[in-house]
């Protein structure tokens, strides 16, 4: 074999080797690129599948307000006007009771209270039939008040839910806050919250999500952590007797089995983010919601140096029936202190 043939063969071998090397390099790059795409896709899917009850998920949403629709003008109270109004939450028409002081409007508007009812069987609830005297006490003290019915209650659209296992009532409340802030007579820098029982539970979530609430008074609230409710005081909470059969528990397990999931839903994981002043009231003979839940919240807030007042009422029940006048006196003093014009200017 002459040198020319040998040289030609070597040339072919070198060219083939170079081509193979180039193919190998680009093939690996392509695989890496595809892997990166896969990782990004997986990451995106994980983000998309965040549970809607997670506190962070609720913080990242928007709750645009608008103008209340006046559905009916009711007879005036002692020192206030009252209206049945409606607003929109996730496209649903939600009704509520709005009260407005008859006094001249302050330069920057009246302070206002989101007033949240406790659990009432939705089919028995009515806009004007529940908590009217409670709301009137605040209205007579110079506060605009708005009590949203919540979805599935009274004439409001949508389906009622279990507040411990759904974000829907919190969403209705956050929309209500936006509408209340937009109301012409309201000073949007002086908004408080009042909640009883289930309304206390909703309120605790709301103050970890929104900084619009400057002061929250929670009466006999379901304000425990998920650990409190499922483990520590489960035997004292009748409304959790069927909790293990809810889809949220079936799909994700109990808090002690899947703490990572439940911690993201639990307002106790976000107590340090609370900017509102908190006031807690509870009767020692409450047989619906154990007083230990309010005691635990008080202790945790104090550890974080948060502003918290705590009142317990000896031998009193879930509605603080024997001490309701004292409890309201303390509540109104609390709002007067934390929702004054001077206080609002600090925010």
What is each PLM-predicted segment?
Residues 2-80:
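N-terminal targeting or regulatory segments adjacent to alpha/beta-hydrolase or S9 domains
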Residues 204-255:
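Hydrolase active-site cap/lid region
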Residues 295-298, 302-347:
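C-terminal catalytic histidine-bearing segment of alpha/beta-hydrolase fold enzymes
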Residues 108-118:
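Short beta-strand element of the alpha/beta-hydrolase
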Residues 61-107:
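N-terminal cap/lid segment of alpha/beta-hydrolase-fold proteins
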Residues 163-184:
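Alpha/beta-hydrolase active-site loop
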Residues 274, 280-282, 286:
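Short beta-strand/loop motif that positions the catalytic acidic residue
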Residues 127-147:
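Short amphipathic alpha-helix adjacent to the substrate-entry channel of hydrolases
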